[in-house]
Amino acid sequence: MHVKRAATAGFCMGVGLALKKLDRELDNNAKDIATLGPIIHNPQVLRRYEQKGVRCYTDPAEARSGQRVVIRAHGIPEETESALAAAGVDLVDATCPKVKRAQLGIARQREKGRTLLLFGEHDHPEVQGLLSYAGEGAVVFGSLEELQNGPLEDDRHYFLAAQTTQDKHAFTSVIEWVRRRFGDHVPVLDTICDATRERQDEAIAIARSVDVMVVVGGFASGNTRRLAEVAQAQGVPTYHVETPDQLPLDAIRGYGAAGLTAGASTPKSIIDETQKLLESL
């Protein structure tokens, strides 16, 4: 089988920086390292760090004074970070710079008295962190339809932002509707990162030129799920797998050309293995 592999597949800048910071702590022989939540959304990578002794705390209360704790790439709520610092926890901030920029941009709009409309996944850790910078009244929505049916008030001064890994085309539709509803003066923060845009555009282009698409990455990874969604929207059969052994070989064996892309937290080794398996069909 011929395979068209996306040039943008694999670790993004934010993931790479976060893992470098965690690796640096391990290289410095720190004995008591933990992350606050999964540092990235890839179970194979997380398993590797667990084998090196890195613990993953789901509850901030697990962190102890003096302990080295790495903040996940998705960021954490502002009040959680402040409480941990006040408790004497030695924090290493591995928040993606694009997420940090979104957090600070939202905080500046809050100071101007504006209310956030956030396009994102309600339960995603990045979204929970962004909301903590927004103040009261923020509205989270996962689709334009949800926003249209949401609790919007005519006398509020809104601004728009998106989870950094959201679908840029869907966000454009949201912007257009909000400005028709509330006026062109509604501020829009440019929070969808360049890597997300580039990956989605390349996934769309490849999907339009192949018989089947394979997207590799963690099932909990929002950006990976979005890649699968935009590829499938082109009308091509699309399979989202975490590892090559999850590929439905009987279902894809008869196709002539396969497209291959991967989420921002997918290691190159797994992408390589998937490509090799596809090419053997």
Swiss-Prot record:
Single GO BP term: dimethylallyl diphosphate biosynthetic process
Binding site for (2E)-4-hydroxy-3-methylbut-2-enyl diphosphate: 41, 74, 124, 164, 221, 223, 265
Record keyword Oxidoreductase present: yes
Binding, isopentenyl diphosphate: 41, 74, 124, 221, 223, 265
Positions of the catalytic residues: 126 (proton donor)
Chain residues that bind dimethylallyl diphosphate: 41, 74, 124, 221, 223, 265
Functional note: Catalyzes the conversion of 1-hydroxy-2-methyl-2-(E)-butenyl 4-diphosphate (HMBPP) into a mixture of isopentenyl diphosphate (IPP) and dimethylallyl diphosphate (DMAPP). Acts in the terminal step of the DOXP/MEP pathway for isoprenoid precursor biosynthesis.
Reactions that this protein is recorded to catalyse: isopentenyl diphosphate + 2 oxidized [2Fe-2S]-[ferredoxin] + H2O = (2E)-4-hydroxy-3-methylbut-2-enyl diphosphate + 2 reduced [2Fe-2S]-[ferredoxin] + 2 H(+); dimethylallyl diphosphate + 2 oxidized [2Fe-2S]-[ferredoxin] + H2O = (2E)-4-hydroxy-3-methylbut-2-enyl diphosphate + 2 reduced [2Fe-2S]-[ferredoxin] + 2 H(+)
Example of a GO MF term: metal ion binding
Cofactor: [4Fe-4S] cluster
EC id: 1.17.7.4
Signal sequence, start to end: none
NCBIfam families hit by this protein: ispH_lytB
Residues annotated as binding [4Fe-4S] cluster: 12, 96, 193
Full protein name: 4-hydroxy-3-methylbut-2-enyl diphosphate reductase
